[in-house]
């Protein structure tokens, strides 16, 4: 068997539809475009989403929502997890050792009444405390 001897399976290929090549072809004269009108003219190209003058679906539906491109920090209440107060230095790695957090967390915010006292222990720029600048 040689590659040049291969043929497509029976019925898998179809002849190209030749438009505007005489009445005998079944697609002559108006070439399947009907009689007159904008769509019958040469160069006509319908805009994406055009619905024949009816208000397009994209304009009928209301605008919805907003998505911020800034990532929200993972919030931890220091009052609920006492082990964070006892850490010598605070970073994402040390917090992960005492509190279960996802690997996808890249920013942490500590909240609570005693959170401000921990500000001096923070050694990671991705960990912040509420109420401090």
Swiss-Prot record:
Supply the name of the protein. Large ribosomal subunit protein uL15
Describe the protein's quaternary organization and the partners it interacts with. Part of the 50S ribosomal subunit.
**Organism field:** Campylobacter concisus (strain 13826)
Mention one GO molecular function: structural constituent of ribosome
Query: Which controlled-vocabulary keywords does the entry list?
Result: Ribonucleoprotein, Ribosomal protein, RNA-binding, rRNA-binding
Q: Tell me which GO cellular component terms the UniProt record holds.
A: cytosolic large ribosomal subunit
Gene symbol here is rplO
HAMAP family, alphabetically?
Ribosomal_uL15
Q: Which InterPro entries match?
A: Ribosomal_uL15, Ribosomal_uL15/eL18_sf, Ribosomal_uL15_bac-type
Give the similarity note: Belongs to the universal ribosomal protein uL15 family.
> What is the role of the protein in this entry?
Binds to the 23S rRNA.
Q: Does the keyword Ribonucleoprotein apply?
A: yes
Q: Which GO terms describe its biological process?
A: translation
Segment Disordered: which positions?
1-57
Where along the chain is composition biased (Gly residues)?
Answer: 21-35
């Amino acid at each position: 068997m040689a590659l040049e001897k291969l043929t497509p399976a029976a019925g898998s290929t179809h002849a190209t539809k030749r438009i505007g090549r005489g009445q005998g072809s079944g697609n002559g004269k108006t070439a399947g475009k009907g009689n007159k009108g904008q769509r019958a003219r040469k160069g006509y190209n319908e805009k994406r989403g055009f619905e024949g003058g009816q208000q397009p679906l994209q304009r009928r539906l209301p605008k919805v929502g907003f998505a911020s491109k800034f990532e929200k920090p993972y919030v931890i209440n220091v009052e609920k997890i006492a082990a964070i107060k006892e850490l010598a230095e605070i970073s994402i790695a040390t917090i992960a050792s005492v509190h279960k957090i996802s690997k996808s967390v890249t920013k942490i915010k500590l909240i609570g009444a005693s959170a401000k006292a921990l500000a001096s222990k923070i050694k990671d720029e991705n960990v912040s405390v509420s109420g401090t600048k």
